[in-house]
Structure formats: C-alpha cells, structure tokens
C-alpha cells in the first residue's frame, strides 16, 4: 500500500462528501438504536461508481476525543489517494466490487446479536419478515476458515447464492453487503440485528420456524420480488 495525496476530480470529491455525510448519519442511528454498543466497530466501504476507487468510513469509536468521520479514499490496488489511514477494507473487498458491479457497499460491523450468532459457527436462517421481504437470500453463512480472506469467501458464497446479504465473521461480527448505497445498507444492518435478537429469543422457546410459503409470497409481494421468486420455484 502506498499513500499518494492527489487532487480527486470533482465528481469523486462530491461523492466522498455525500458518503461521509451518510456515514455520519448511519453511525448516529446505529448507536441510538442500540444496534451497536460498547466499542462500536463499524467499517463502511462505499465504491465510487464507474471507478476502481472506494471510500473507507470508520466509526471513530467511544475513546476518540475527536468523533469527526475522516474518509480514506483508496484504489482497489491499495493506493491511498486521500486521507490518513489504511486501505485494508478497500483492498479486502476489491475483488467483490470488481466481479459484482451491482454491489455498492460492504460494512464490517460488530453488534450484540449478530455477534452472538457469529460465536456459534452456525448457518443463520433468515426468518424475520422485515429482513426476508428485502431479499431472496435465505441464509447467512459463517466464515470460519480465516486463511481465506473475507472477500474471497464472499465471492465463493455469491456463486452459490447470488442474493447473499451477509456473512458472519466467526467469533467476531458480520460483513453485510449492500446494493443500494450506504444508507440503505445501514437500514439493513438495523433489521438484521433485530432479526438476530428475535431468533435468539425464539431459541429459548423451542426455536424459530421457517416461513410458510404463503408468508413468503406476501413478504416478497410487498417489495416486488414475488415474480422472480416464482420463476426460481421459491414460492
């Protein structure tokens, strides 16, 4: 990785300003809703459309005297173009961005209930209606073998599940995938954390139960996914 302070073109600069503003809002909401607590690890990476550049936006954390969000702009090759910090998360997801132009954003997040499920090394079935209606994906897999990078693991899982929305970082948190920008990704994280909590509570009551197909039809019908679900034989 090298650091090369250059003048970014106006479109990239404007994108970085907007992404930083969105990240500030997301960090505030994720804290206020209790989605993250304690150390509050949240690392967004937002690709700059039409380029091989991404913006890394990290929550400063509770110990920071200055809570200002400082973006790091880096190329997929690891060169830092603007800001002080590592391009690690950018390079970690670069293969994913290159192979899947529909993916706009990835966030690495530690939250209590998603983190709890990450401790189990179990595949997490999506059984919360507010999450399921947003995706045709039905599960969140655990990334256990850390000799394989997160980006490579995500790529492999996308070949099995093209609608994948997240993976668990075994014994850590989750990497959540966005296809509609940073704020929509942050909203998904809030819902995933809610669902993880509800399903954990259900574990104490005998376990959560999968959707009836009629319920899946209702949920996907609300978000325009029902026709594709029928084409795939999911309902």
List the predicted regions and their residue ranges.
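Glycine-rich flexible loops
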Residues: 1-235
């Amino acid at each position: 990785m090298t650091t090369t302070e250059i003048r970014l073109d106006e479109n990239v600069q404007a994108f970085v300003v907007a992404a930083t503003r969105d990240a500030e809002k997301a960090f505030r909401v994720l804290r206020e809703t209790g989605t993250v607590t304690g150390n509050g690890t949240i690392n967004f990476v937002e690709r700059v459309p039409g380029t091989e550049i991404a913006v890394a936006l990290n929550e400063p954390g509770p110990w920071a005297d200055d809570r200002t969000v400082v973006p790091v702009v880096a190329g997929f090759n690891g060169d830092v173009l603007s800001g002080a910090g590592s391009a690690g998360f950018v390079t970690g997801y670069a293969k994913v961005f290159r192979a899947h132009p529909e993916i706009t954003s990835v966030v690495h997040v530690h939250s209590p209930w998603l983190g709890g499920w990450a401790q189990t090394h179990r595949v997490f079935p999506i059984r919360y209606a507010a999450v399921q209606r947003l995706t045709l994906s039905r599960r969140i897999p655990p990334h256990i073998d850390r000799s394989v990078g997160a980006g490579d693991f995500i790529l492999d899982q996308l070949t099995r599940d093209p609608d994948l929305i997240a993976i668990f970082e075994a014994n850590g948190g989750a990497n959540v995938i966005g296809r509609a920008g940073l704020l929509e990704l942050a909203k998904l994280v809030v819902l995933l954390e809610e669902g993880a909590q509800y399903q954990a509570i259900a574990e104490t009551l005998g376990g959560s139960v999968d959707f009836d197909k009629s319920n899946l039809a209702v949920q996907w019908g609300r978000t325009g996914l029902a026709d594709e679900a029928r084409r795939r034989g999911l309902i």
